[in-house]
């Protein structure tokens, strides 16, 4: 699913006129978690939500050429609008291409620093040792999955998940487990997963913002969105390997990646097979080199901390 390109023709709108004094006061009454430097609070349905069709637009970030997205825009509460120094639109292929050139695996799509390891609860920014594209979505049963006052059935819930997460960027797979009250959403690019993780955190699956506001006032719990752990299923690992190989194959000239026709000579087939073999060897070499470099960096970091 490609995002609406009409946002390029308009300025980004202000999502929130001003910061609520009630929210600021409420934040100051909570305890501080000294390990993560954040306020501790109970989860509830957010009264703010990103509307990609209405909120997307041009900002100062587009003029400056930044690759970083606005975190507050993703959460539906940026008060700067077109004056914001960060991007206000859904991540597109061009953003991913720019990230590969100008970005760094040490930062997420919002410019926040990643860590060597994921948190134990798989929340937070994530790890720079792994480009995770799969999100774990929990607490679905309590996230206001209702229609006309009645609970949705399993098929309707999965359809709602596909719609709500699909409008934030192209997805590869969605797996809903009603007996576990959770789902797994896998995106095509990791920057899209990073964006969607923040955009759908503490949201509901309702289509009405008015219903979200009512649920927020009732302290109802929203969606629990965090990083999915690596799937031990061999089929899942095969899919991951295939994705990496396809990404490297896309870097080859078109004539070396086209499927040979029946009239293609044996020489052409041999050249294509050799190119594919080189790409697979390159993938294994890059993986080993990257792993070794990251391990070396972790050792240096531990020495610095000592």
Swiss-Prot record:
Mention any one GO cellular component term assigned to this protein in its UniProt record.
U2-type catalytic step 2 spliceosome
Q: Does Membrane count among this protein's keywords?
A: no
Which chain segments does UniProt annotate as zinc-finger regions (C3H1-type)? Answer: 64-91
Where does it reside?
A: Nucleus
GO biological process terms, semicolon-separated: mRNA cis splicing, via spliceosome; positive regulation of cell cycle; positive regulation of RNA splicing; spliceosomal snRNP assembly
**Is the keyword Transport assigned to this protein?**
no
What are the protein's UniProt keywords?
Cell cycle, Metal-binding, mRNA processing, mRNA splicing, Nucleus, RNA-binding, Spliceosome, Zinc, Zinc-finger
Q: Which residues form the RRM domain?
A: 133-230
Ranges of biased composition (kind: Low complexity): 251-268
Q: Write down the Pfam families for this protein, in alphabetical order.
A: Torus
Classify the source by domain of life.
Eukaryota
Instruction: Name the major location.
Output: nucleus
- Per UniProt, what is one GO molecular function of this protein? pre-mRNA binding
Database matches in InterPro entries: Cwc2/Slt11, Nucleotide-bd_a/b_plait_sf, RBD_domain_sf, RRM_dom, Torus, Znf_CCCH, Znf_CCCH_sf
Q: Where is this region: Disordered?
A: 251-277
* Domain remark in the UniProt entry: The C-terminal RRM domain and the zinc finger motif are necessary for RNA-binding.
PANTHER family with a match to the protein in the record: PRE-MRNA-SPLICING FACTOR CWC2, PRE-MRNA-SPLICING FACTOR RBM22
Q: What is the annotated role of this protein in its UniProt record?
A: Involved in the first step of pre-mRNA splicing. Required for cell growth and cell cycle control. Plays a role in the levels of the U1, U4, U5 and U6 snRNAs and the maintenance of the U4/U6 snRNA complex. May provide the link between the 'nineteen complex' NTC spliceosome protein complex and the spliceosome through the U6 snRNA. Associates predominantly with U6 snRNAs in assembled active spliceosomes. Binds directly to the internal stem-loop (ISL) domain of the U6 snRNA and to the pre-mRNA intron near the 5' splice site during the activation and catalytic phases of the spliceosome cycle.
Q: How does it assemble?
A: Associated with the spliceosome.
Protein family: Belongs to the RRM CWC2 family.
Protein name as it appears in the record: Pre-mRNA-splicing factor CWC2
Source species of the chain: Candida glabrata (strain ATCC 2001 / BCRC 20586 / JCM 3761 / NBRC 0622 / NRRL Y-65 / CBS 138)
């Amino acid at each position: 699913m490609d995002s609406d390109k009409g946002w390029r023709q308009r300025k980004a709108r202000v999502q929130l006129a001003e910061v609520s004094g009630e929210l600021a006061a409420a934040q100051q009454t909570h305890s501080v978690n000294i390990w993560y430097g954040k306020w501790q609070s109970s989860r509830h349905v957010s009264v703010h939500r990103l509307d990609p069709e209405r909120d997307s637009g041009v900002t100062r970030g587009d003029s400056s050429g930044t690759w970083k997205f606005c975190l507050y825009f993703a959460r539906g509460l940026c008060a700067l609008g077109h004056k914001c120094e960060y991007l206000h639109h859904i991540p597109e292929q061009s953003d991913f291409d720019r990230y590969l050139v100008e970005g760094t695996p040490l930062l997420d799509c919002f410019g926040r620093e990643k860590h060597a390891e994921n948190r134990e609860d798989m929340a937070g920014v994530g790890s720079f040792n792994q480009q995770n594209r799969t999100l774990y979505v929990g607490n679905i049963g309590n996230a206001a999955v209702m229609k006309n006052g009645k609970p949705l059935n399993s098929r309707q819930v999965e359809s709602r998940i596909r719609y709500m997460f699909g409008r934030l960027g192209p997805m590869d797979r969605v797996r809903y487990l009603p007996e576990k009250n959770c789902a797994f959403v896998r995106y095509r690019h990791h920057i899209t997963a990073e964006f969607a993780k923040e955009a759908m955190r503490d949201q509901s699956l309702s289509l009405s913002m008015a219903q979200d506001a009512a649920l927020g006032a009732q302290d109802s719990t929203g969606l629990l969105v965090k990083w999915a752990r690596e799937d031990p299923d061999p089929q899942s690992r095969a899919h991951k390997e295939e994705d990496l190989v396809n990404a490297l194959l896309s870097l080859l000239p078109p004539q070396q990646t086209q499927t040979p026709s029946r009239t293609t000579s044996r020489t052409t087939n041999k050249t294509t097979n050799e190119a594919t073999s080189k790409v697979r060897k390159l993938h294994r070499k890059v993986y080993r080199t990257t792993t070794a470099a990251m391990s070396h960096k972790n050792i240096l970091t531990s020495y610095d901390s000592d």
